[in-house]
């Protein structure tokens, strides 16, 4: 057969192939998804299933609009059109034993709508005890089938959302034939209520299927039917949810690409994969050890290659001379010669050779000499042959005779000795056959002798697996088996043997042909004598030759009865040459062939069947299946299961088909950003499904070769232990230092707790012949033979360019890199099992080049961690460096079938692309008034986490430093990434001046020699070129530099590019004042505490609040244009406040870099770091209007300061307290008593008092300054508020006028009550005593319309008021009820009067009250 076949030959797959006990089934492998308007059914099994016999019916309604308004109608319409056929069948014959078709009742059912998956669904409970009662089903469990339930609650038939769903009992459904609810006497319902008994006793299985009768809803058509669902059976592979066709869950996750749909109709499985199945076993409960038999076959005969492992013949059948040199097979076993003689010893000159064993026929003893022909003579065995059997004909039948060694306790293990010498040496062997001496000359060959045979044979193979499976929901057992287990696999086939004999009266000669082209000769067999000839053949394939063998030793007897009879008898013996034969591997039945002739001379021919059976070594079983053609795209596999506890064989078969897929390699899209920061890398995905070897621990497993039970046979198979690694890669690439991996003789596992958890067992581990190279720069997996000879080298080969790929250390064992596939995620039936994708993360960086770890310098290519490579290159080699990945499949089948097309090997190159770096000024023009012009270097490959710096040094060198860059524990290395080539200025007259890049010049030209990355990982760094420094170095002024061109040139080592930035230097206008506004300070005027004169006290000005701050507006359009996209600010550099008693100042000292504050006394109040004076902020980006204000405040205090009369120009003292302070960075700094700066303008006892202050302010834009004067004025503030007595009290009066308030309520004053009650408060805490001044006017002498008297008062009085500690809103005394004393008013005539009240600090003093200043009572009656 041609080895290379197509990826899928569907027509051949679907052929019915007889294997073992039943044909391959062609039913659905996996329940197909539900199409729009269709229906499907799923058996609810597995972990979390709440009961047995639950079937989920799903109708896809995605083709119509479903909303809250119509969901009830949609559910009822859909459910009313679902019909279910429930039946019972004989599991062996398929005959129907009962059937009923049911529908849902019009009410009383449980149905739901899933708004995410857009399906209507209903769960029916069919089996006891839930045939008549509902069972609750958690949404978390149902989400395995309907993932949308994880994110949204379903709606029930009433339209309400629910948190769980309930089943509809089978017994509540309506029999469509009667229109009535099915009765308990219904045979199907009766069977379902006793399903275990029915299955075990009557071989019954229960089957249900659904049909959606055709209907129209929302203008869309609905119809369809489900796959049959088997509820229970005696012991079968379930057809739901996984069907009898087994499948790998990775198939339905897109990993088969265009072949994904095969999972539903044609279950293809790649080699060495976990495949899923569900068994229904009503005989079992709890944990059951199952044995699975896998039968492999392909259509038609196969062409197989075999090689001669041994030639065994009686000495009379050997040529008199021939050349021979033993061939060493892949496992180290050597081919040998077997010479049968009657001599007790053979002689070779002076050398005497002892026999390896002997056998006896009819009393005559024959000696067997097993010899390897090599370079020396040895009396010590070089290898052994186990259980060599000779069949011989007798007069009536064929008899077997084992060849024994009487000197050995293991009498069937025959030693093989070596004879020989240098090439060309002739060995002459002498021995007898019967009584005739024979001499044979063997010349030692210069090349090994290997005889090959080719045969056309119809082959099949059988393998066994064992796994202990437990369940929480009998009778369903879900498990996983291996598609091609590493176990002893029996490969069998049928051929023929043909013989032609020439018979004479005294002797006969014959030729025997077997295995198509293997010919054995028998020369001159005398009558009544025996003659022997035979071969031992081994598979003629590099990886498995010498591991297993088939022995054919044929004995011939020439006899005379009534006819001349030439009889042949041959043994057919499977052998494992490196292992003792397994207990179940017995000699096959002998074959025989007889040639008869009534008279001689005569020539006769004959034919007889010949059997072939190889038992593979577990570690090479997969390779053997491939080499023999039994695993490939034409492979059909049937699987039977055996319940070892109940001794039951599955009634039906599971099945799957083989598939071999070539690998592919790809990268996720990437650009320069994949190579910048430490967490950036390129992901390379290698797709090689057939090579999945080592899944993650949660989905991996171990196999052990242990005795298994299958029917009445004891066989050996692979016992699967989930939870640990299957394969144990180790070893060193090459021909030496090979470590196969020691067998683990004892397993210790925890108790089984789930379907895939391990059990305790003891045995020997079989490792697949698949070991890993430990050189991470040339990471190979390779199939290596037992003697260390590599056969298939595969895996990932990596070549780094342009620098060599050296390891980070000189250690002899740097460790090897596992290519681990990803793990499948929930809701995969086997979460954690391997996917067919290997994800390899590749970092390429120059940033840690030259870093050291211990004593080792980091550079080149090395492994950072599992599945992660780092390629470290010099910065000058970074762009254009690449990693060339060559992936050779590690799967033998892929190599075998795709070798001729080369598809077994794929390539990918990951290269670092170039980028466009940029050196630029922010504007094509630069105002010369700026202190410096920004210069930006944008180089993406310089990008790194913050902070990252570039330092400029002598000659313009740029040193890159990124202290926070760490890649797998290795920090970045400071390195030179480029240099400034030149800085020049071309004047307006065309003259170009180049500035030498000396240390002094660099320090003058660059305000900061360190540029910081502006944003993490973006690679943009900001520098600044000093305009003043440029003027200094060129000895030019602003006018001379006007309209000149500044040029900077930089060379980048990483990209190899030379970058140039230019800007035109332009002289622009200075800043100018546009507007300014005065500040306002409020004072509270009162009188200094009583001084002994009741009618006079000195004025006391208490500073209370700054009600308005001084502000300025400047125009500086040129400054704004330096960065028109940003809102800029002008800085204040000096503020001097000049007042009545002196001046205070706040200024920035650019030399010291400090802000200095001095008060009105000339004292330094504070020295602050940096310029903390207020700034003027641009109103909008680029508009050039800047505005800002000074921030003054009043700091209250109790220190009363006397203001000299020389300052106030009065004849009396003036007092003040409260300090004027400036606010900087949120903190107030006192400049001195506010009254020493300014006082309100008031007239006090005929004298004018008052003064303003002036703030002299200097503003700078970094180039020029502007100074302006802004006044600060003072206002007198009167805090006392008066209000008439009212209930409830209203104080202060709401909405009262500032000056006068007339109260026209009736007031009566009697001689007994010469008082007037009012309420008094202060809007600021007022701690001093004050007077309520009362003036009384006759009503006829007061104009109430103007609020003014027309004559002098007829009475006045003063009433003292004081509250402790203070009067006022927010104090403990918010207001006072004051009785204004009017003693003596009764002396006035009775009549109508007007009383005017106001608050004064002392008698005759200024008014302290406001809102109103005067409280006027216009309706006062005085009685007598």
UniProtKB/Swiss-Prot annotation:
Residues 1-24 form the signal peptide. The keyword Amino-acid biosynthesis does not apply. Glycans are attached at residues 60, 70, 276, 295, 342, 358, 377, 468, 517, 545, 559, 581, 633, 714, 875, 914, 955, 989, 1018, 1042, 1093, 1134, 1197, 1217, 1252, 1276, 1304, 1419. It is found in: Secreted, Cell wall, S-layer. Keywords: Cell wall, Glycoprotein, S-layer, Secreted, Signal. Glycosylated. C-terminal glycosylation sites are modified with a heterogeneous family of glycans, with the largest having a composition Glc(1)Man(2)GlcNAc(2) plus 6-sulfoquinovose (QuiS). One of its GO terms (cellular component) is S-layer. Coiled coil: none annotated. InterPro entries: S-layer_large (IPR053694). S-layer large protein. May form the highly ordered outer sheath. The mushroom-shaped unit cells of the Sulfolobales' S-layers may consist of three SlaB subunits and six SlaA subunits. Belongs to the Sulfolobales SlaA family. This is S-layer protein A.
